[in-house]
């Protein structure tokens, strides 16, 4: 397979097509957001609470709103209000919650319910997919 070369100018041009709208949870530095943009999507907002990650994201995509709180505190109403949209109007609610507790390479069930170091915090991460499911239920993306 031949590599696909791109730069931020191309990403911006492709994103201006506005073919679909996206909010990305657990966005990190913007890997999935870049893919959506290259596919012609408009990333309206992201959620990321790790400072180094959201600062990197903001440097690459300064026009995207960043919800900087823990996803557990993010509510559908926050998204609707900030983006001036209603339930069911967003096309894609993307999320990549930490998965080490489920991974064959990770500790799997043995670590379930335990707090562990995640970036510069100590917290449970195995339950974050429930938060993603909650937001999918409440936002009701198309």
Over which residues does each language-model region extend?
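Conserved active-site and SAM-binding loop architecture
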Residues: 1-142
